[in-house]
Curated annotation (Swiss-Prot):
InterPro entries (alphabetical): EryCIII-like_C, Glycosyltransferase_28, UDP_glucos_trans, UDPGT_MGT-like
Gene behind this protein: yjiC
Gene3D superfamilies attached to this UniProt entry: Glycogen Phosphorylase B
UniProt name for this protein: NDP-glycosyltransferase YjiC
Similarity-based family: Belongs to the UDP-glycosyltransferase family.
Organism: Bacillus licheniformis (strain ATCC 14580 / DSM 13 / JCM 2505 / CCUG 7422 / NBRC 12200 / NCIMB 9375 / NCTC 10341 / NRRL NRS-1264 / Gibson 46)
E.C. numbers: 2.4.1.384
Enzyme class: transferase
Length: 396
């Protein structure tokens, strides 16, 4: 094996970087030299894997308040292609400079980190695609089920792309499979999972202990109450009205409620916090899910997989189109309930929890999905697939 060099490219977002951390650690343990360009926020997380973080500047601002405004104003969403053109123009030269004299033997790139794909093409290096969400083929695409995923460039955006420093880039490339595609979910959760060929390896969630998220003081009390976790993730959480609904819905109930409200909301800003509530900006989600009996989530793929891996029924309140697909999938597979955000009230939250909590059919489906997740193999299976690809038959 020697000390072959693997480079991992991603975007600066927890929902994309977190699924890769256990895989990164596994590759390092197997003797590979792994480099991972990240922004300042993720340096510590990458260092904990044993990989070498390389610093770069990004134009993407994953600010929850701005994201909420974007989601409310669909017209602003049409600016997304320009944001990605700007990001690739900013990032690609930095990556070229970082790797010009230190070319990797293999590149792994998140499906949204298109600069990684372009760099692989420029250097003539084989690349493996990482899917932190659904895989797509002729039977299942985001675009076929939601108009919001169809990317049609305006004349202004077409001009911006033509005048950019990017090689012949096409936004449709984001949906094109590579020779090997690592998908961080079990095949049983993927719509039309049986139709995906040998290029797709469904490894399930790649989970690792996250020291960078640990808290010194325990969050879960020994009150004996069942634990409910409420979290809308790290990017789509600027929704104070939702948290007030949760307080109204579960005040003085049997639940010990742990609620993560994100970094744009001050936990002290809530008046009259019930005795059975604990409110924080961030929580060690994996640790809490080990003891939780119910998870109210935004339906992000990371959170969904973490909840299912821990055997926790879900109530999903999606904040964007991809999460809407996941929330529907959770309900159709009998793993929990789906609430439309615009219809969410304290009463509907109570009702969804009441229908999910302790339901033997839901618990059975959850246990079945846990088995699928375990059988998928996680980070070690992903590393096995990458090693096989890197062997002489794959990368010369």
């Amino acid at each position: 094996m020697g000390h072959k060099h693997i480079a991992i490219f991603n975007i600066p977002a927890h929902g994309h970087i977190n699924p890769t951390l256990a895989l990164t650690a596994s590759l390092v343990k197997r003797g590979y030299r792994v480099t991972y360009p990240v922004t300042d926020e993720f340096v510590k997380a990458v260092e904990e894997t044993g990989a070498e973080p390389l610093n770069y500047r990004s134009t993407l601002n994953i600010d929850p308040q701005q994201i909420r405004e974007l989601m409310k104003n669909k017209k602003d969403m049409s600016q997304a292609p320009l944001m990605f053109i700007k990001e690739m123009e900013e990032v690609l030269p930095q990556l070229e400079a970082l790797y010009e004299n230190d070319k990797p033997d293999l590149i792994l790139f998140d499906f949204m980190a298109m600069a990684g794909k372009l760099l692989a093409e420029k250097f003539g290096i084989e690349a493996v695609r990482l899917c932190s969400t659904y895989a797509q083929n002729e039977h299942f695409t985001f675009r076929s089920i939601s108009e919001e995923f169809k990317i049609e460039l305006t004349p202004e955006q077409e001009d911006a792309l033509k005048n950019s420093n990017l090689p012949s880039f096409n936004f449709e490339d984001m949906f094109e499979p590579a020779k090997l595609n690592i998908v961080f979910m079990p095949r049983a959760f993927q719509p039309y999972g049986e139709t995906f060929d040998e290029r797709f390896s469904f490894v399930g969630p790649s989970l690792a202990k996250r020291k960078f998220q640990e808290k010194e003081t325990p969050i879960i009390s020994d009150s004996g109450r069942p634990v409910m976790l409420i979290s809308l993730g790290t990017a789509f959480n600027a929704w104070p009205e939702f948290y007030h609904m949760c307080i109204e819905a579960f005040r003085d109930t049997k639940w010990q409620v742990i609620m993560a409200v994100g970094t744009t909301i001050d936990p002290e800003s809530f008046d009259d916090i019930p005795e059975n509530f604990s409110i924080h900006q961030r929580v060690p989600q994996l640790e809490i899910l080990k003891k939780a009996e119910l998870f109210i989530t935004h339906g992000g793929m990371n959170s969904t997989m973490e909840g299912l891996n821990a055997g926790v029924p879900l109530v999903a309140v999606p904040q964007m189109p991809e999460q809407e697909i996941t929330a529907r999938r959770v309900e159709e597979l009998g793993l929990g309930k789906h609430l439309q955000p615009e219809d969410t009230t304290a009463a509907s939250l109570r009702e969804a929890v009441s229908q999910t909590d302790g339901d033997p059919h839901v618990l059975k489906r959850i246990q079945d999905m846990q088995k699928h997740i375990k059988q998928a193999g996680g980070a070690e299976k992903a590393a096995d697939e990458i090693e096989a690809f890197l062997a002489p038959a794959g990368v010369k």
